[in-house]
Amino acid sequence: MVLVLLALLAATAPFVAPYDCLASQGILNAKNLSPSLDYPFGTDQFSRDVLSRVICGSRVSLSIAFLSVLLAAAVGTVFGAVAGYLGGWLDALMMRTVDALLAIPRVLLVIAVATLWDGVGIAGLIWLLGLTGWFGVSRLVRALVVSAREDEFVTAVRGLGASDTRILAYHVLPQVIAPVLVAATLSVGNVIVIEAGLSYLGVGVKMPDASWGNIISNGLGDGNFTSTWWVWLFPGIALMVTVLAVNLVVDGLRQALSARQLPAR
């Protein structure tokens, strides 16, 4: 429920935010105001309403997370399915490639590419996080496909003359969807944290666009840890609640998947 509300908030951010996310509220009289009835989350050093920026930041952060995870799941599923179904030397080559890529720490790889590719932007960040996040999914899918292709039902369908493409699309991949959904949902929380870290370091979402990471960075900059605590605290709470909600959804999906796999009595 919390995750659904956050998604709705992100989708309607421009209409729900009480003020323009980028506009100041008056440089002279609204700078670094503490939380009040007019500005429930206070304002920052540029006289921007923090509540509005947190709401707009949810749209950016969640969009990056969901779209990059969707991209990673799609690439990983196709790669792992091809490797697992065809097998042989191609499977070995593809999996050794994945092993080599997994040996590179993802965060360091993303930081290096984002730093070299200055001004990566929101779209570039989605591609970057998506194309560095499919390795684990491909291994999971490959293992599931190897198991599924040996099922008696799949063997029978193959004996009836069904093509490999049809077998893979209609009889093997449907068995993979649920575990991939769990893995992808778990990745959402990780990607949100990675994006926030990149934006905090200045190599992710650039100002004046708002993401939770760069709002926190803005609040902690110039020694403002205690003097303007509201600027970093509220986006930090939003980040924590979102990651917690994602993890709870993952636990629910795992329990549902485990219940489906239990033998009938």
Please identify what each model-predicted range represents.
Residues 1-77, 81-82, 89, 107, ...:
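Gly/Trp-centered helix-boundary motif
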Residues 14, 134, 138, 187, ...:
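Alpha-helical transmembrane segments
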Residues 40, 44, 50, 71-76, ...:
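Generic hydrophobic transmembrane alpha-helix motif, especially the helices
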Residues 66, 70, 74, 78, ...:
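Hydrophobic alpha-helical segments of membrane proteins
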Residues 78, 88-89, 163-164, 187:
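Short coil/turn motifs that cap or connect alpha-helices
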Residues 96, 168-169:
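Conserved glycine-rich helix-kink/hinge and helix-boundary motifs of the Major Facilitator Superfamily
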Residues 102, 113-117, 145, 186, ...:
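Glycine-rich helix-loop "coupling/hinge" segments at transmembrane-helix boundaries
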